[in-house]
A protein has these predicted regions:
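Structured beta-strand/turn binding interfaces of compact recognition modules in eukaryotic regulators
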Residues: 156, 191, 204-206
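Conserved short secondary-structure elements within globular domains
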Residues: 161, 169-191
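A short beta-turn/loop motif at secondary-structure boundaries
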Residues: 191-197
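C-terminal edge-of-domain segments
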Residues: 197-207
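Generic structural hydrophobic/aromatic packing signal, biased to beta-strands
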Residues: 126, 151-153, 176, 190, ...
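Core residues of folded domains in eukaryotic genome-function proteins
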Residues: 147-149, 184, 197-199
Length: 245
């Protein structure tokens, strides 16, 4: 009598495939399945932005979100107005008491280390729909210590799609830095790279003064649609700095 082959179902321990890190596997599955939660986050964020701007794009999905962000920047009388509007949008995404309690109870623990590390992890988990693939990394603090409170964005989808330094700076970088510090008690500096569209978040570190921030002196991107329109009306453009940065 021949022995019957025993067919063993795959165990939980053997999944995901050994060749793929668990975090990378889960991320690939989320995107492969259409990203239900990504769609929820996108729709919520766009809804809040539309309420602030008072206008919506006819385009669906992410393309429409970028058009609303562009409208927010172009219709604001000053860059400060754009930043303040973007901060209000970020605040509207959270229950007010949550922000207050986080700033009061979590932010002071261990000199801000716990809060910075927590926010970095939450950002990496929940914001890929907006920025694209990102990972938590270590950042060096001014006192010489290191915290795992950084988030490295490989290629920011928001910057790549908007193609605009001004949108990056005024609707993302500056308002996010201000929101984190003022409403969550966590200092943050964001360092976008306009050459490869990567971005480094450093939670727990104060941003430089405006006059020392090289990001605010960036020229317009060659592919910026707003810069292209300006060139159609005038040749006297300061190409050394984006007028909206």
């Amino acid at each position: 009598m021949k022995a019957l082959a025993v067919i063993r179902p795959p165990s939980i321990c053997s999944w995901p495939p050994q060749s793929l890190p668990k975090s990378q596997y889960l991320r690939s599955q989320r995107f492969r399945k259409g990203g239900v939660m990504d769609e929820v986050f996108l729709n919520l964020f766009r809804k809040k932005m539309v309420e602030e701007v008072g206008w919506d794009s006819g385009k669906p999905g992410y393309d429409g979100l970028i058009e609303v962000a562009n409208r927010l920047m172009l219709e604001s009388p000053t860059n400060s107005h754009t930043k303040e509007a973007a901060v209000r949008i970020l605040r509207s995404l959270f229950p007010p008491m949550l922000l207050q309690l986080y700033k009061l109870l979590i932010a002071p623990i261990q000199g801000g280390k716990v809060a910075a590390i927590m926010v970095a992890r939450v950002t990496a988990i929940t914001c890929e729909w907006l920025m694209g693939p990102c990972t938590v990394n270590s950042v060096d603090l001014p006192d010489g210590t290191s915290w795992n409170s950084g988030v490295f964005v490989e290629k920011c989808k928001y910057l790549e799609q908007s193609k605009c330094v001004g949108i990056c700076v005024n609707t993302c970088k500056l308002p996010t830095q201000a929101f984190m510090k003022d409403y969550m008690g966590v200092p943050l500096v964001m360092e976008p790279n306009f050459s490869d569209y990567s971005c480094q978040f450093k939670f727990g570190i104060l941003p430089p003064l405006p006059e020392d921030d090289a990001t605010l002196k960036e020229p317009c991107l060659d592919i910026c649609p707003n810069a292209t329109r300006r060139r159609e009306f005038t040749r006297n453009i300061n190409v050394q700095q984006c007028p909206k940065a």
